[in-house]
Regions:
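Vicinal oxygen chelate
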Residues: 1-5, 14, 81, 85-123
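Short hydrophobic/aromatic beta-strand element in the GNAT-like acyltransferase core
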Residues: 13, 43-45, 54, 71, ...
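Conserved short beta-strand elements that form part of the metal-binding/catalytic scaffold
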Residues: 33-68, 114-120
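Short secondary-structure junctions
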Residues: 31-37, 91-95
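N-terminal beta-strand motif that seeds the catalytic metal site of vicinal oxygen chelate
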Residues: 1-23, 52, 68-70, 121-123
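Mid-chain, well-packed structural core segment of small domains
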Residues: 69-84
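Short glycine/proline-centered loop/turn elements that form peptide/ligand docking sites
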Residues: 20-22, 38-44, 97, 123
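Conserved active-site tyrosine of GNAT-family acetyltransferases
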Residues: 22-29, 84, 112
Length: 123
């Protein structure tokens, strides 16, 4: 049995210099659709043609290749975080919440790769 139970949702988070330009590129070339863009959060989400997989575009001043961070959906981010911390998984800072949207936390695998867990607060 796994430490946490994941939902059937996965967000691939990419850092981009220009979210509007990046969104248009993904729409034009890959057929993705923009579903939400929140300027205050510096975040845009797009549906992909893969069920349960969302592309997230986050603002950054400097992009470095290979910056993809998988964001795994969970039913309760606080419970999932506690379960992972209980088995010594390292987290980066506090859990962040954007009211009415998402609650998320960043953690690391044994090689230092960043991963995230996220609870959907929109419903």
């Amino acid at each position: 049995m796994s430490t946490v139970e994941l939902t059937q949702e996965l967000t691939l988070a990419l850092s981009v210099k220009d979210r509007a330009k990046a969104s248009q590129w993904y729409q034009t070339h890959l057929g993705f659709n923009e579903v939400v863009s929140i300027d205050e959060a510096g975040w845009t989400e797009m549906t992909t043609n893969v069920p349960g997989v969302t592309l997230g575009l986050g603002d950054t001043d400097e992009v470095s290749p290979g910056n993809c961070v998988p964001v795994f959906g969970v039913k309760n981010v606080a419970a999932a975080r506690k379960a992972l911390e209980d088995v010594s998984v390292k987290f980066d800072g506090d859990t962040m919440t954007v009211e009415g949207m998402v609650s998320l936390a960043t953690f690391y695998d044994p090689d230092g790769n960043a991963l995230m867990i996220a609870e959907d607060l929109s419903s």
